[in-house]
């Protein structure tokens, strides 16, 4: 069965894999095919497969073992995930959520460059100064504060509320937490340099550069998360995780075209 519905593909793929497991196509103790083969068979991206496998792992059907692959450990769900209607951003796949942030926050940064004040710039510079003193960059409060302050620089508090909610609700997202279990605790996600590029564009009040810098920052985050978990899932990352129809074409950045 080839999956053609473009909406929430990883959920459809997870349902198909669960059906195969429950019907005995894959038995307890078996390994699922490598992700690249599932992606080719279903004609979907590897990030869709990654999110589907994470969903199966959260529900207790499979266990992803470092250097060994994806093992079937149960033919029935061990853990049921109930959607929390009060946490609308806590129920999405991690790469789906990052893609949404990339689309929204790159446009927020573009608009912020047209509205930013001297006070906004001073606050962003102070945040960066504090962030430089961090011992560990991952899950830093200063990372969150920078993104919120960029949104506040639009002079639209509703945009800042959206950014904050998308960020903070990750801690309630079982798929986001499961993905991070596969990341080495020693991994450093050095986002400070990316933030510097965003800040420089805002100082220049350059909307296009601000949009590109925010887009690239979240692209770097997606690539880091994908690459850092790939050893466990046994395949290499694509260069661009959501390459279809990108809002910003990074290859054209040097020419300044949109």
UniProtKB/Swiss-Prot annotation:
Residues 7-75 form the HTH gntR-type domain. SUPFAM superfamilies: GntR ligand-binding domain-like, Winged helix' DNA-binding domain. Residues 35-54 bind DNA. GO terms for molecular function: DNA binding; DNA-binding transcription factor activity. SMART domains: FCD (SM00895), HTH_GNTR (SM00345). InterPro entries: GntR_C, TF_FadR/GntR_C, Tscrpt_reg_HTH_GntR, WH-like_DNA-bd_sf, WH_DNA-bd_sf. CDD domains: WHTH_GntR. Keywords: DNA-binding, Repressor, Transcription, Transcription regulation. GO terms for biological process: negative regulation of DNA-templated transcription. The keyword Transcription regulation applies. This is Exu regulon transcriptional regulator. It comes from Escherichia coli (strain K12). The gene is exuR.
